[in-house]
Amino acid sequence: MDLFEYQAKELFAKHEVPTSAGRVTDTVAGAREIAEEIGKPVMVKAQVKVGGRGKAGGVKYSADVDAAQANAEAILGLDIKGHVVKKLLVAEASDIAEEYYISFLLDRTNRTYLAMCSVEGGVEIEVTAEENPDALAKIPVDAVKGVDLAFARSIAEAGKLPAEVLDAAAVTIQKLWEVFIKEDALLVEVNPLVRTPNDEILALDGKVTLDENAAFRQPGHEAFEDKDATDPLELKAKENDLNYVKLDGEVGIIGNGAGLVMSTLDVVAYAGEKHGGVKPANFLDIGGGASAEVMANGLDVILNDAQVKSVFVNVFGGITACDAVANGIVGALKTLGDEANKPLVVRLDGNNVEEGRRILAEAAHPLVTVVGTMDEAADKAAELAFAAK
């Protein structure tokens, strides 16, 4: 999960990383109020999860309150690379003597943590890495030993930071490592990490990516979720612990197991070529449980997608037997009632398949068609979706 800058700075403050004072707002009046509270020149900064804010006019220096208000008016609603600005960070402007770069990230290729540091900050680090790779130091970090002050100082030295700020930089670098580890981050980046005329070190910007797989031990991270930017169907699925990804097709898909669902996407896409080019509408994996509640939650998500014209339920009975799946489908349709208004093509195979098919046949729901093979089911689902377009 990528964070907004203001959220990254909340984590920085939690771990005593020095930053400039400021608050977030979503109104022009709020920006003016914050600027008045600070009582000094401020930076008005667009809060979007994309780079290039400054070049796009999303970061403005404001010498006084009136300038802050005018800049807030100009930035709110601005489109930056497809991201509309809905929030602003109004922060105290800092005197800058020099700009550096520091980050911690997970190096998947080498299966280790990596620190990157450079005396050349304030610019796109990708440009520095390409045009002057020697200016960007890359230091592997032992996951067990971590980063103490001595190692943090060696990171700053490798990045060729000036000797007079090494101690102050080491303190900040060590605290950024603390953010990285204690918050279960995949990336912690500060660009620029600035030196003030008084040789103070400040994190003027911040980029943090959190590991969503660690959410179970980070209950506070739920507050960082950007619900405005997340598809409402994906939010509903997440609330019900369903693995769901919305796609752009017309055939809704429910399966048990990621491999089976991905295979189902392929066969539906292939079948769709014969039926007007219809495509899969989603990826939805209900995992090992196919109870009536789980099936109802899954169908509720898919049937609320206006693009979906038919639903393909593809289940291989293993630990969860096919009769349990069939009972889940029947129960789900009863639970949903009139909301279940699109045809379902069901393919069952595996443990207790005959009993599962018997249960569905006995229920005789007018929306349900039971098909024997995966290819036949995909073809039928694509045909029904095309007919309903």
From Swiss-Prot:
The keyword Lipid biosynthesis does not apply. Signal peptide: none annotated. Mg(2+) binds at residues 191, 205. The lineage of its organism: Bacteria, Bacillati, Actinomycetota, Actinomycetes, Mycobacteriales. Keywords: ATP-binding, Ligase, Magnesium, Metal-binding, Nucleotide-binding, Tricarboxylic acid cycle. Pathway: Carbohydrate metabolism; tricarboxylic acid cycle; succinate from succinyl-CoA (ligase route): step 1/1. It is an enzyme of class 6 (ligase). The keyword Ligase applies. SUPFAM superfamilies: Glutathione synthetase ATP-binding domain-like (SSF56059), Succinyl-CoA synthetase domains (SSF52210). It catalyses: succinate + ATP + CoA = succinyl-CoA + ADP + phosphate; GTP + succinate + CoA = succinyl-CoA + GDP + phosphate. ATP binds at residues 45, 52-54, 94, 99. One of its GO terms (molecular function) is ATP binding. This is Succinate--CoA ligase [ADP-forming] subunit beta. Binds 1 Mg(2+) ion per subunit. It comes from the Bacteria. The gene is sucC. Residues 9-236 form the ATP-grasp domain. Its cofactor is Mg(2+). One of its GO terms (cellular component) is cytosol.
